[in-house]
Amino acid sequence: IEFIKLCTNNYKCKFFLATGKKYEEQEILKKILNSNFKNFCKALDNLTISETLPIIKICNLAVCNDTSFSHLSAALEVETIVLMTDSPLLYGSYSPKMHPIIPDGETTVTHNTLGKDKINPEKIFNKMKEILKLS
């Protein structure tokens, strides 16, 4: 939510939220959709992959954890910020379209880094500005 706040306070943005159906993912989705930023967001969790891919393709940027969506968006030639929390860095950096962010306090990531609570929204925001050449 902090990243969405940084973006909407500075730029005109729309967020497409592609999540799975796992409980934890749905809880995060609900939290975002019940926040002050709900009007900037569209949930894609009820769409099929084939319905989701064209939406990803038209985005200027994707911000994903290291899941299938990060690999799909990079394959679709969308600049992709990959939030690396528990996977080897190679999984989120093999494409020139992938821009990994690692947890604060870490120099690299591996399986079981357990870094999801240490991803810094400011780092994501600054990387977004760099990729999109925003001031």
Q: Predicted segments — roles?
A:
Residues 2-85:
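Donor-binding and catalytic core of enzymes assembling or modifying cell-surface/extracellular glycoconjugates
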Residues 71-134:
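Nucleotide-sugar donor-binding patch of glycosyltransferase catalytic domains
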